[in-house]
Amino acid sequence: MFKWLHKKKDTMNRSKQTVMSDITPAHIEVLKENEIFVFGSNLQGIHGGGAAYIAKTHFGAIMGCGVGLQGQSYAIPTMQGGVKTIKPYVDEFIEFAKAHTEMHFLVTRIGCGIAGFRDEDIAPLFQNAISLANISLPKEFIDIILAQ
């Protein structure tokens, strides 16, 4: 994995440098010992499809547990309502990641599959994660955050 350094112009035409976290691979089949697969879930913890199913079958997600760290996975609920209902769980995840710098979190495109949200809906929720060295985000999310 590698770090990205992007320059962005703000509305005042000043140059900003934003240190980028690693980009989450599009397909994750194997994790290193310290890596955590971050996926979209439902509050009931029924990990029946999409990234949730992968988390259950490969990375230790527990049926019946819809939030937080489980094995080498971390569940963020995305199926309970609109984007506003997802934000507190993303904020909680970011605080968890800050407290656990020994772990590296690979965030998938949560909410952008079965839950039916667009990258443009979800990416801004991760604005405060973009500079954290132990959180990788999907390229789609990074591009949207940098464009803001």
Predicted regions and their residues:
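Macrodomain-like recognition of ADP-ribose-binding/processing modules
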Residues: 2-148
